[in-house]
Amino acid sequence: IDFTATVDTTQSGDSTKVEFNDDININLDVDGVVKAEVGLGLTDGKMSHTGGNIIAGEKAGLYTITLTYKKSAGAIADSFSYTCTLTKESTLPEACYLIGEGIKGWTFPGDAVAMIPAHSEPGCFWAIRYIEAEKGFKFSEINTDWGKDFTGRTTNTGYTVKDNNCYVAENGLYMLEVDYKNGVVTVSKAMIYGMGDAFGGWNEGANAFTVSGDKFTATTAAAGNLRMYAGSTFAAATGNWWHREFNVFDGKIEYRAGGGDQAAVAVTAGQTVTLDFNAGTGSIQ
């Protein structure tokens, strides 16, 4: 028996997993303590229930992934195998950078700041920065030199362009987003949200962080695993909060980007989470 799916990868080396349910686990009791593993990944190149992600291919683009099942006793790998075939290579840029006085400086590559790939949205990148109104910035497809820099695409909102540089109207924390596929660049008020038990629920768009100068802060409502994400103006992000998820590890902000679930970060009720995106740091106290 063959099962096929088409996957549009954002970047070269993107990965996926196989699920037989709407999750890689099925809860077997009310409390969710006992679970059955029903997903498939790779262990030493072979299919297994507890394996890692399946790398689609070395190039970004459309892939046809075929999962083949044949009844066989023994290990999972004796019953399941897969193939990944590139059917259309992507022509979209695989990266986006910010450069300029409003970001860090005008010198490549040291002053260029990499934007984050949005999960499951090919060609979309995002970043949060505190930007001062009188300091200009630009976008770039590369971080090595000038020549691929730009101030916008087809549709541009939330900023002005003067002397071939971008400017915001006032000092503040901004969400910068680029969609190469649809030719869109937006700059909007940055919004950070908590998600899950640590913030009292799983409702998207609730549990907003507070802006404190050039930082975000929030207080956890209960014990649980810390999960956070950035709000987006892009339609594909609606209902997909995890497309722009991140967390704090050893004092640094680390982004999910195109990867799987990040490692759990346990917190207790009443802890203060502080995020400094310009510095790339965070604290949980």
Which residues fall in each region the model found?
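Insoluble glucan recognition modules
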Residues: 1-285
